[in-house]
Amino acid sequence: MGLIVQKFGGTSVGSVEKIQNAANRAIAEKQKGHQVVVVVSAMGKSTDELVSLAKAISDQPSKREMDMLLATGEQVTISLLSMALQEKGYDAVSYTGWQAGIRTEAIHGNARITDIDTSVLADQLEKGKIVIVAGFQGMTEDCEITTLGRGGSDTTAVALAAALKADKCDIYTDVPGVFTTDPRYVKSARKLEGISYDEMLELANLGAGVLHPRAVEFAKNYQVPLEVRSSTETEAGTLIEEESSMEQNLIVRGIAFEDQITRVTIYGLTSGLTTLSTIFTTLAKRNINVDIIIQTQAEDKTGISFSVKTEDADQTVAVLEEYKDALEFEKIETESKLAKVSIVGSGMVSNPGVAAEMFAVLAQKNILIKMVSTSEIKVSTVVSENDMVKAVESLHDAFELSKHPSAV
C-alpha cells in the first residue's frame, strides 16, 4: 500500500484520552496496510506554559535558550504517543526533529527547513514500525536546536510527506475541514469537499487559521495532497490539491476575514518612487507587515494609505515620524477599528464582474468600503469592524456558498 503522514495539533493531543485517540487513528491506517508517520505538536497549552516559565526568569530570554526550552514540549507528546501505540500492541518509535534528520536555517524562533535526511525514518518504516516525529523543530548544520515558528508542526508534516514521497498528508484538527467561512460567525457555512492549493494559500494568508500559509506553500511546491480532518470524527474532511475538480462551478470558494486592522495615511509626500521605496523598506526592517496600499496624486504632492495590524500601528507611526525630515511629508493620520473581508475563488479568473458584484452587495447593506485590493483569485475590502460580520454574512448569502455546487 502507500505511505500516510498524519499530523495532530496541540488541541488534538491535549490529554491522555486524546493521545489514545491519535494512536487509534494511526493504527487504523496501519491496518489498511499503509506505512504511517505521525507528526505531533506539544500537548494543549504546554508551549504557552513554557513561555510563561521563561518570562518568569527573564524579560528578554535569549532566542537560542527559548528554542532549547520550547523544543521539549513536543518530546513529551512523541514519547506518550509511542507508549500508547506500544501498549496497544503496535511497534512504534519516536524521534525528535533533529533525530528525524530535519535540518534548518540558523534562525532561532522562526527557522525554515532546508533539508531532510530521511534515511533513519525510511529504515524504521521498512521494519514495519509506526514512526512518531516531533513537529515544530529541527537542527542547524552546527547542531543548534531551532524551532520553526507559528504553524511549524504543519510545515514539519508536509515537509516529511514531500521528502518521503508520501501518498497523502492528513492534518487532524478540532474542526472537520475547511469551511466556506468561519462557522462560528456564519451558521450556514458549509464544509468544502475540495479546494485548490492556490485558494487555500490565499485563505490562509488572509487569516483562515486552519492551516499555516508556509505549510500550504510547501504542499503546492511539492504536490503533496493534504486533507484537513476532524480528530474526533471519522467522516472525510477537505482535500487540498492542484486545482480541485470537486467543485469547479464555484466562482467564489470561501470568505476570509480579520479584525484589528488600522489604516495609516501619509499626506503631502514629495512625489517620487524613491520616497515610497524608502517608506516600505524602513517599515520592513522593523518587521512591520504592510498589506493593502493605495496611492493618490494631487499636483506635485503624493498621498499614500496602507493597512497594518492594529498591534503594529503605534510603532508604524513612530518609525515614520522618526524619518519625517528625510521623507518630507506633511502629516500622518490613522484610522483604527477596521476589518478586512475577502472573497477567494479560482473561478474569478474566467468570470469578470465578481468584484463589482461584491461591491454592490456591500453597498446594498450600507457598508462603506474604505480600501480595496485584488488579485486573480481574490478581492479584499477594508470596512468598519462594526460591519465585518454583516459583510461576511451578506457576501456568503449573495454568492450562495451554503449550497452544494450541484444545487447552485
From Swiss-Prot:
Lysine-sensitive. Regulated by degradation in response to starvation of cells for various nutrients. Ammonium starvation induced the fastest aspartokinase II decline, followed by amino acid starvation and glucose limitation. Coiled coil: none annotated. Tetramer consisting of 2 isoforms Alpha (catalytic and regulation) and of a homodimer of 2 isoforms Beta (regulation). Catalyzes the phosphorylation of the beta-carboxyl group of aspartic acid with ATP to yield 4-phospho-L-aspartate, which is involved in the branched biosynthetic pathway leading to the biosynthesis of amino acids threonine, isoleucine and methionine. ATP binds at K7, F8, G9, G10, S41, T173, D174, F179, T180, T181, D182, P183, R184. Residues 264-337, 343-408 form the ACT domain. Belongs to the aspartokinase family. Substrate binds at residues 25-30, 47-49, 74, 125-126, 150-153, 289-291, 295, 354-355, 368-369, 375-376. GO terms for cellular component: cytosol. GO terms for molecular function: aspartate kinase activity; ATP binding. Its EC number is 2.7.2.4. It is an enzyme of class 2 (transferase). It comes from the Bacteria. Transmembrane segments: none annotated. Keywords: Amino-acid biosynthesis, ATP-binding, Diaminopimelate biosynthesis, Kinase, Lysine biosynthesis, Nucleotide-binding, Repeat, Transferase. It catalyses: L-aspartate + ATP = 4-phospho-L-aspartate + ADP. This is Aspartokinase 2. GO terms for biological process: diaminopimelate biosynthetic process; homoserine biosynthetic process; lysine biosynthetic process via diaminopimelate; threonine biosynthetic process. The keyword Transmembrane helix does not apply. The record marks K7, E74 as: Contribution to the catalysis. Pathway: Amino-acid biosynthesis; L-lysine biosynthesis via DAP pathway; (S)-tetrahydrodipicolinate from L-aspartate: step 1/4; Amino-acid biosynthesis; L-methionine biosynthesis via de novo pathway; L-homoserine from L-aspartate: step 1/3; Amino-acid biosynthesis; L-threonine biosynthesis; L-threonine from L-aspartate: step 1/5.
